[in-house]
Amino acid sequence: MLNGFIFKEFAILQDRCAMKVGTDGVLLGAWARGGKRILDIGSGTGLIAMMMAQRFRDAIVEGVEIDADAVGQSRENAGRSPFADRLRFHHAPLQAWEPEAPFDAMVTNPPFFLNSLQAPDKARARARNAEFLPFANIFSFARRWLAETGHLSAVVPAEAYEAFATEAFLQGFFLERLYHVRSTSRKPVRRCLVSFARLRPEMYEEKTVELMAPDGGRSAWYDALTEDFYVK
């Protein structure tokens, strides 16, 4: 598919989006906790929102995104999917957006450049630069709009994890799941899947997982996680 990806139940076009479909988004969409009302913060192409809509068949899934082109394309992607009646995308900065009601779950693949260095592609730089969506703003929004029993799940680069988790703790959230993700057992951890709760969790889960098997294919863990999405 030119300028896009075909998954088992939907397709993603991305020619007007600064941030393209990647492993991070697929991981989060397949791993995150859900609920009846789900919000994707920085929804981009709509990939994660659509994965959540596929996994949680009764959920209303909304996305909020600052880039107008991405919002337009995510709406078109959603409109071609089987979940069109349960997906809504809003064009607004998170800091200024007021949803209609609280959410049971939030997901985010947040900007991760922690300095002001801008890439040549301004749209891509904005999508990836934490100056445009500081971690503090994500958690202050979640304090207002995440249900008391809700969960906030994210995927962040390993080097950004401490800053992200520190902000969560400062704003009263509890870490309930942490997966250290590496490509193979011989490679360093490159990204972290994290889940925070408003209430202190009864159990805490932490593990290290690999994306690739020794033969170069998907690992058993990654294959099981994404089997409902990737076309074989």
Which residues make up each language-model segment?
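SAM-dependent Rossmann-like transferase core, predominantly class I methyltransferases
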Residues: 2-37, 43-50, 54-55, 192, ...
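A generic structural signal for alpha->beta connector loops
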Residues: 9, 58-60, 84-86, 149, ...
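General small-molecule cofactor/ligand-binding pocket signal
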Residues: 13, 88-90, 176-179
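Conserved Class I SAM-dependent methyltransferase catalytic core
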Residues: 17, 132-189
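Conserved SAM/SAH cofactor-binding pocket of Class I
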Residues: 27-101, 105-108, 114-120
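Residue-level signal for inorganic ion chemistry
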Residues: 28, 109, 138, 196
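Mobile active-site "lid"/loop adjacent to the S-adenosyl-L-methionine
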Residues: 110-137
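SAM/dcSAM-binding transferase cores
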Residues: 186-232
